């Protein structure tokens, strides 16, 4: 039986990022993500996880290195790089839905304006996606009428409307009430099962273990451990990762005991 070799989708080579005061944020970051793979970035606050996603998306300048999508450069302001970055989707902690537009109009805006798609086709896809996340009855509602979890589900399918090759998720449940976290994570889990390539930053450890094909652990702007989710959560290679997981275990016990 032949082994299926996955193609590289994203490659990052020796990425360097510093703030304006020259303090380094990302230090010699190199990683790759294969098509259909889900890679989870873990690490303490301030380790550079979210900044890494923002640099991939072109929202932050870099001081060195390469970011390639299917072998093509996506760094910089050139028309070619900007066009390639349209193959990326990103969902943030904040939903960033336009408050004066209905949910349906929020979903239609980018496909029609950026990709020039016909309204009829875009409406059909938007309704199919709303049905997938159980929000068919909300297409004419406005963002203020939705819960946080519902808004985040809309934000996810708004990115899917652009048919991204790679999805970036930056702490998408961080701003949600605990009861709303599951409904959003279920959507992301379903996307992984459908083969969507994803790079995910999260502090939801149980979710990370369930969804990841690989775990990258960051500390001080560097990748200090790469592992399978099974090995990382059972017996991480580095002492720093062990401390990190012990801290989360302590937090969980504290919450359970209250």
Predicted regions and their residues:
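ABC family nucleotide-binding domain
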Residues: 5-220, 224-229
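C-terminal boundary and immediately downstream tail of ABC-type ATPase nucleotide-binding domains
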Residues: 230-258
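Short, Lys/Arg-enriched, disordered terminal segments
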Residues: 1-6, 258
């Amino acid at each position: 039986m032949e082994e299926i070799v996955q193609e590289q989708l994203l490659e990052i080579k020796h990425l360097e990022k510093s703030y304006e005061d020259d303090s380094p944020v990302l230090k010699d970051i190199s990683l790759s993500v294969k098509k259909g793979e889900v890679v989870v970035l873990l690490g303490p606050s301030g380790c550079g996880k979210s900044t890494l996603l923002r640099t991939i998306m072109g929202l932050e300048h870099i001081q060195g290195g390469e970011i390639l999508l299917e072998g093509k450069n996506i760094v910089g302001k050139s028309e070619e790089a900007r066009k390639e970055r349209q193959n990326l989707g990103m969902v943030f902690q904040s939903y960033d839905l336009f408050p004066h537009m209905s949910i349906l109009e929020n979903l239609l805006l980018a496909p029609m304006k950026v990709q020039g798609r016909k309204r009829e086709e875009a409406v059909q896809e938007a309704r199919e996606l709303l049905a997938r996340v159980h929000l068919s009855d909300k297409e004419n509602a406005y963002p203020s009428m939705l819960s946080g979890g519902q808004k985040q589900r809309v934000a996810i399918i708004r990115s899917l409307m652009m048919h991204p090759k790679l999805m970036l998720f930056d702490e998408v449940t961080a701003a949600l009430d605990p009861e709303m976290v599951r409904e959003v994570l279920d959507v992301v889990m379903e996307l992984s099962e459908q083969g969507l390539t994803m790079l995910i930053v999260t502090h939801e450890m149980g979710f990370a273990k369930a969804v990841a094909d690989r775990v990258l652990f960051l500390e001080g702007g560097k990748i200090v451990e790469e592992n399978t989710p099974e090995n990382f959560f059972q017996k991480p290679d580095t002492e720093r990762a062990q401390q990190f997981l012990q801290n989360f275990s302590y937090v969980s016990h504290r919450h359970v005991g209250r």
